[in-house]
């Protein structure tokens, strides 16, 4: 059984223009062959579908949205499922949530990780594919999109809840994949806490863990013979001028057979200045990609070095945030050093 997983998809700016005129092949032409060769293909829908006037929720950061054509494009590209546990799913409130679910289902796409309440949002997706039973668990870190008993939104990352979800999934399936939307935006390594959490998911039965959210790709590791991918990067997310890290990513294909999980990484560029489509890397570019991934993997395997890289990144990026944080809070941060603003274990 071959399962393909892609990262963050948000049809905006130039991509939105192409999709609204129905030029899906310009964006996904090189990807469709990959999805068509897979038994099941999954992508993260990083924005709600909003077809009617809707009020934005109060939050920090941009409010993202697309039309139903953004979902139709995914179906054309060969995807079977979208993950909805992310920090933008609730950007336009419950109206956006219900319209997103309706658009996905009318296009024949499965959904996981989001719903009209926490019961629906936290539900594991089960699929029978070529005689194999696959379970997909999707969750995200807490920001502005989390569902509860009475409100729509995304399934939150909660280690206790995911523990029970994995245990239950393994009773009902042959393979369980956990897809998490988390990490530090624009930082190309996982925190040590992420590593600890995702390894725990493997320990309790997950056959693979896949992460996205950071807007840049990260490395991976094999833990107890199971793969953990710490960041796929943007799949299609226009942001011209944002740099190579923003425009680089990879698709992962998981091949399940017996107790083995083999995988392939398919690197690409997306939304460059001269090409808004997803373009697979050429041979010389793939060599550079492999070198970068190997360096990330080396750092991930060394907790001390990984934490050092994280703290260095915090020091370099703290400046822009200091101007928007309450000065009194900053004084408390200084008093509490060396925990830093974004602490990790």
Language-model segments: what does each one mean?
Residues 14-29, 64, 128-176, 196, ...:
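Binuclear metal-dependent hydrolase catalytic cores centered on His/Asp/Glu-rich metal-binding motifs
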Residues 12-14, 49-52, 87-101, 118-123, ...:
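Active-site environment of divalent metal-dependent phosphoester hydrolases
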Residues 333-345:
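Single conserved hydrophobic/aromatic residue that forms the stacking wall/gate
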Residues 122-136, 227-296:
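Binuclear metal-dependent phosphoesterase catalytic core
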Residues 38-50, 86-87, 169-189:
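Short acidic, glycine-rich surface-loop motifs adjacent to enzyme active sites
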Residues 78-81, 191-251:
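Conserved beta-sheet core of the metallophosphoesterase superfamily
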Residues 1-85, 93:
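N-terminal catalytic scaffold of extracellular/periplasmic and nuclease hydrolases
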């Amino acid at each position: 059984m071959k399962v393909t997983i892609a990262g963050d998809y948000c049809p905006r700016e130039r991509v939105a223009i192409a999709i609204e005129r129905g030029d899906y092949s310009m964006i996904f032409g090189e990807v469709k062959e990959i999805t068509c060769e897979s038994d099941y293909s999954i992508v993260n829908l990083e924005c709600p579908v909003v077809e009617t006037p809707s009020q934005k929720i109060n939050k920090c950061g941009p409010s993202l949205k697309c039309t139903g054509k953004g979902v139709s494009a995914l179906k054309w590209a060969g995807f079977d499922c979208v993950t909805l546990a992310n920090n933008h799913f609730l950007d336009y409130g419950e109206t956006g949530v219900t319209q997103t679910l309706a658009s996905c289902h009318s296009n024949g796409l499965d959904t996981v990780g989001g719903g009209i309440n926490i019961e629906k949002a936290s539900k594991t997706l089960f699929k029978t594919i070529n005689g194999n039973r696959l379970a997909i668990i999707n969750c995200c870190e807490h920001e502005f999109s989390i569902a509860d008993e009475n409100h729509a939104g995304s399934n939150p990352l909660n280690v206790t809840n995911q523990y029970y979800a994995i245990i239950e999934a393994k009773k009902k399936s042959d393979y369980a994949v956990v897809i998490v939307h988390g990490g530090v935006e624009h930082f190309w390594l996982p925190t040590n806490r992420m590593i600890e959490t995702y390894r725990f998911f493997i320990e309790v039965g997950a056959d693979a863990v896949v992460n996205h959210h950071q807007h840049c790709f990260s490395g991976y590791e094999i833990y107890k013979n199971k793969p953990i991918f710490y960041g796929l990067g943007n799949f299609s997310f226009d942001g011209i001028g944002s740099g190579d890290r923003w425009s680089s990513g990879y698709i992962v294909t998981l091949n399940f057979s017996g107790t083995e999980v083999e995988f392939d990484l398919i690197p690409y560029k997306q939304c460059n200045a001269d090409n808004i489509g997803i373009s697979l890397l050429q041979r010389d570019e793939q060599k550079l990609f492999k070198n970068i991934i190997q360096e990330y993997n080396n750092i991930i395997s060394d907790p001390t070095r990984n934490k050092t890289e994280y703290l260095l990144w915090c020091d370099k990026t703290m400046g822009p945030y200091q101007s928007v944080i309450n000065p009194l809070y900053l004084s408390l941060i200084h008093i509490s050093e060396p925990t830093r603003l974004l602490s990790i274990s």
